[in-house]
């Protein structure tokens, strides 16, 4: 199971630490959040204590009206649950009873200056990305005309050389050799490079190249959705290759299907141009036009006449 430490959350979202948990640290395992207004009112049935707890203006206003003894009792019960942390938004005041209860039970108590809705949206997006299922595969990922193209194939087939030629033609490199794939939401895949090799590319006979330094910041990007997979393979005279584009092929990563094309490689074929055209044709299909289907309709119509 993927998880995020509260320390990482504090650093990445620039949160103010009011109380720091020293020995009772609980990792975050879900991107869902809970607003504990009902809990401070004394209702604990179906309490989602495993979620990040968020107190906004409504919850804080309610808490401000509670007598000291009542709040102390309810805060003590609230922090007795194994919550990862409690975050107060809008830089609102935090009553001493809540601070003391957080210290007693060794829980994180944090604060942000952001408004509740804005912060919750940012928090959920952040946790969705951090907690997303992930795999690492051998391949190259390039942003071609806004389409994330994942190049697959055996070592030495020409993936890196094709990616470099695409960069030279104005497209952007995302990852070379190793691509980390995360599942974002129900049906979206996002790819990136491991941080240690980000923006580097290996070309046999030359070695390691820093694409960002050679071609500028506009030649790279940190992550990209995976919209199209292109499998490069040695040309096999005995194998049938689709010449019309009527048959759709897919490949599955993390239970998400992605359109796939198989492109045979042999001397004289300009793979970079073929990948460019494949990306443009994919975008055209997304916009509702399929050239192969249109030609097939015209042929059937002519045969019918």
From Swiss-Prot:
Entries under SUPFAM superfamilies matching the protein: HprK N-terminal domain-like, PEP carboxykinase-like
UniProt-listed InterPro entries: HPr(Ser)_kin/Pase, Hpr_kin/Pase_C, Hpr_kin/Pase_Hpr_N, P-loop_NTPase, Ser_kin/Pase_Hpr-like_N_sf
Chain sites annotated for binding Mg(2+): 160, 202
Important for the catalytic mechanism of both phosphorylation and dephosphorylation: annotated segments: 201-210
Enzyme class: transferase
Top-rank taxon, per record: Bacteria
Active site positions: 138, 159, 177, 243
Purpose: Catalyzes the ATP- as well as the pyrophosphate-dependent phosphorylation of a specific serine residue in HPr, a phosphocarrier protein of the phosphoenolpyruvate-dependent sugar phosphotransferase system (PTS). HprK/P also catalyzes the pyrophosphate-producing, inorganic phosphate-dependent dephosphorylation (phosphorolysis) of seryl-phosphorylated HPr (P-Ser-HPr).
NCBIfam families for the chain: hpr-ser (TIGR00679)
PANTHER family: HPR KINASE_PHOSPHORYLASE, PROTEIN YJDM-RELATED
UniProt protein name: HPr kinase/phosphorylase
Organism: Caldanaerobacter subterraneus subsp. tengcongensis (strain DSM 15242 / JCM 11007 / NBRC 100824 / MB4)
Encoding gene per record: hprK
């Amino acid at each position: 199971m993927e998880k995020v430490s509260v320390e990482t959350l504090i650093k990445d979202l620039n949160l103010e630490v009011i109380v720091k948990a020293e020995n009772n640290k609980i990792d975050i395992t879900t991107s869902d959040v809970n607003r504990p207004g009902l809990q401070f009112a004394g209702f604990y049935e179906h309490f989602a204590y495993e979620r990040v707890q968020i107190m906004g203006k409504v919850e804080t206003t309610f808490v401000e009206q509670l007598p000291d003894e009542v709040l102390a009792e309810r805060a003590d019960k609230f922090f007795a649950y194994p919550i990862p942390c409690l975050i107060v938004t809008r830089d609102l005041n935090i009553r001493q009873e809540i601070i003391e209860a957080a210290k007693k039970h060794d829980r994180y108590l944090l604060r942000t200056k952001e408004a509740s809705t804005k912060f919750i949206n940012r928090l959920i997006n952040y946790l969705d990305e951090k907690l997303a299922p992930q795999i690492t595969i051998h391949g190259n990922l390039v942003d071609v005309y806004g389409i994330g193209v994942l190049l697959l194939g055996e070592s030495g087939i020409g993936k890196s050389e094709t990616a470099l030629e695409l960069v030279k033609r104005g497209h952007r490199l995302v990852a070379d050799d190793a691509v980390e794939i995360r599942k974002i939401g129900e049906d979206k895949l996002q790819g990136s490079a491991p941080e240690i090799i980000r923006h580097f590319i290996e070309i046999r006979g030359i070695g390691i190249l820093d694409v960002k330094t050679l071609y500028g910041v506009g030649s790279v990007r940190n992550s990209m959705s995976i919209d199209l997979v292109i499998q490069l393979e040695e040309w096999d005279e005995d194998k049938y290759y689709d010449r019309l584009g009527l048959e759709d092929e897919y490949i599955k990563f993390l239970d998400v299907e992605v359109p796939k094309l198989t492109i045979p490689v042999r001397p004289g074929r300009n793979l970079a141009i073929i990948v460019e055209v494949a990306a443009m044709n994919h975008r055209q299909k997304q916009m509702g036009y399929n050239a192969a289907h249109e030609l097939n309709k015209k042929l059937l119509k002519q045969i019918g006449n």
